[in-house]
A protein has these predicted regions:
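Structural signal for interior beta-strand "rungs" in well-ordered beta-sheet cores
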Residues: 1-84
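Long, leucine- and charge-enriched amphipathic alpha-helices
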Residues: 83-116
Length: 116
């Protein structure tokens, strides 16, 4: 474990895990065996990291993020599975449009079926 690492309560750090300097591990985080955290990493509460994962320097994960693959340095990751914050926001915006798209699709199906 590196210098100046803060670990909150109810966190589980597996065997052979390497943690860099200046890391913050919030409550209820689980890090599976042989994973490696770079320097200045912040893991939000209930983040889960699969085994043998490399987390680069200056990475932040949002609460309840599940990391299933390596994360390059400087990324902000959210969700399950973990994706970059930009992609997660894009997905959220698209999801808000879904009810209207479903209605439009149903309307188009009615129009097409009437023309047959």
């Amino acid at each position: 474990q590196g210098n100046n690492v803060k670990t909150d309560n109810l966190s589980q750090i597996g065997h052979n895990v390497s943690i860099g300097n200046n890391c913050l591990i919030c409550a209820q985080v689980g890090i599976a065996g042989s994973s490696r955290l770079g320097n200045n990493v912040v893991l939000g509460g209930q983040t889960g990291i699969s085994d043998n994962i490399l987390i680069g320097d200056n990475v932040i994960t949002g609460g309840a993020t599940k990391v299933l693959s390596n994360v390059p340095s400087g990324k902000i990751m959210l969700g399950y599975p973990a994706t970059s914050m930009d992609k997660q926001i894009e997905s959220y915006k698209a999801l808000r449009k879904l009810p209207n798209l479903v209605k439009q699709f149903a309307d188009l199906k009615k129009i097409i079926s009437k023309k047959r």
